[in-house]
Swiss-Prot record:
<keyword id="KW-0511">Multifunctional enzyme</keyword>
<comment type="pathway">
    <text>One-carbon metabolism; tetrahydrofolate interconversion.</text>
</comment>
<keyword id="KW-0028">Amino-acid biosynthesis</keyword>
<feature type="binding site">
    <location>
        <begin position="166"/>
        <end position="168"/>
    </location>
    <ligand>
        <name>NADP(+)</name>
    </ligand>
</feature>
<dbReference type="Pfam" id="PF00763">
    <property type="entry name" value="THF_DHG_CYH"/>
</dbReference>
<keyword id="KW-0486">Methionine biosynthesis</keyword>
<keyword id="KW-0521">NADP</keyword>
<comment type="subunit">
    <text>Homodimer.</text>
</comment>
<feature type="binding site">
    <location>
        <position position="191"/>
    </location>
    <ligand>
        <name>NADP(+)</name>
    </ligand>
</feature>
<keyword id="KW-0560">Oxidoreductase</keyword>
<dbReference type="InterPro" id="IPR046346">
    <property type="entry name" value="Aminoacid_DH-like_N_sf"/>
</dbReference>
<dbReference type="GO" id="GO:0005829">
    <property type="term" value="C:cytosol"/>
</dbReference>
<dbReference type="Pfam" id="PF02882">
    <property type="entry name" value="THF_DHG_CYH_C"/>
</dbReference>
<dbReference type="GO" id="GO:0035999">
    <property type="term" value="P:tetrahydrofolate interconversion"/>
</dbReference>
<protein>
    <recommendedName>
        <fullName>Bifunctional protein FolD</fullName>
        <ecNumber>1.5.1.5</ecNumber>
        <ecNumber>3.5.4.9</ecNumber>
    </recommendedName>
</protein>
<feature type="binding site">
    <location>
        <position position="232"/>
    </location>
    <ligand>
        <name>NADP(+)</name>
    </ligand>
</feature>
<dbReference type="GO" id="GO:0000105">
    <property type="term" value="P:L-histidine biosynthetic process"/>
</dbReference>
């Protein structure tokens, strides 16, 4: 068999168009556009690309974006002071701090400084906690985007065996909560997991997000499984690949996301969905 492709780019385009129309409706009603502040500290090339993609998406969705490109030498108190200013700015509905941050800045402290109702990445402990107790508000953007992809399969998720490979705060942990909320029986695999292969083979829904190119061989994938590859890794020859060996997995899976063009565009689109939701909270 050959898997059906979950085209994240096409879905993201649809989401951005819907947001654009909703923003236009709000403007007709005399309401302001949603505002997103994007903070980049330092000159990491990959981070700069991600920020540029988010700005382009804002333009397409009709969301006002304000950029704060700070030098590598920015101190933690300086960054926190900027966040305080943005927290108090009524025109800003969402605050995004591009990760990773320079080593002298503590990311957890920075994330916790963002007002939870402006935390459109969904990283704040308050928002993670609400997700954990089945009362989500602003959901973590990558897991929320993945859930949109999963729903697009029209398969019943309730009761399925789901395996999350990776336990990061950004993807693995909140993704496991989303799958639990959807009624899956969820297993989280991490660096201390023994016999990873056996867990992967059992997965009817497999989500992988570890940042290691092709670490999951395609022949581990269960026949007919839904495979979501969060990883994006650049090889020495410049090729971008995921954490799953796509070329072999595509022959066994029922559904699979490509890399690039799968989870990445959905993360950006979901970020703007969250920004619109925040705007609706601030200016109904």
């Amino acid at each position: 068999m050959s898997a059906r492709i979950l085209d994240g780019k096409a879905m993201a385009d649809t989401i951005l168009a819907v947001i654009h129309d909703k923003v236009a409706e709000r403007e007709v009603q005399g309401k302001r556009r949603p505002g997103l502040a994007v903070i980049l500290v330092g000159g990491d090339p990959a981070s700069a690309v991600y920020v540029r993609n988010k700005k382009r998406a804002c333009e397409r969705a009709g969301v006002n974006s304000v950029s704060h490109d700070l030098p590598e030498t920015t101190t933690q108190p300086e960054l926190l002071a900027l966040i305080d200013t943005l927290n108090s700015d009524a025109a800003i509905d969402g605050i995004l701090v591009q990760l990773p941050l320079p080593v002298h800045i503590d990311a957890e402290t920075v994330i916790e400084r963002i007002r939870p109702d402006k935390d459109v990445d969904g990283f704040h402990p308050y928002n993670i906690g609400r997700l954990a107790v089945k009362m989500p508000t602003l959901r973590p953007s990558t897991p929320r985007g993945i859930m949109t992809l999963l729903r697009a399969t029209n398969e019943e998720l309730r009761g399925k065996n789901a395996v999350m490979v990776g336990a990061s705060n950004i993807v693995g942990r909140p993704m496991s909560l989303e799958l639990l909320l959807a009624g899956c029986t969820i297993t989280v695999c991490h660096s201390a997991t023994r016999d990873l292969e056996s867990f992967v083979r059992s997965a009817e829904v497999l989500v992988v997000g570890v940042g290691r190119p092709r670490m999951i061989p395609g022949d581990w994938v269960r026949e007919g499984a839904i495979v979501i590859d969060v990883g994006i890794n650049r090889l020495a020859d410049g090729k971008l690949v995921g954490d799953v060996d796509f070329d072999t997995a595509v022959e066994r899976a029922g559904w699979i996301t490509p890399v690039p063009g799968g989870v990445g565009p959905m993360t950006v689109a979901t970020l703007l969905e969250n920004t619109l939701e925040a705007a609706l909270m601030h200016n109904p």
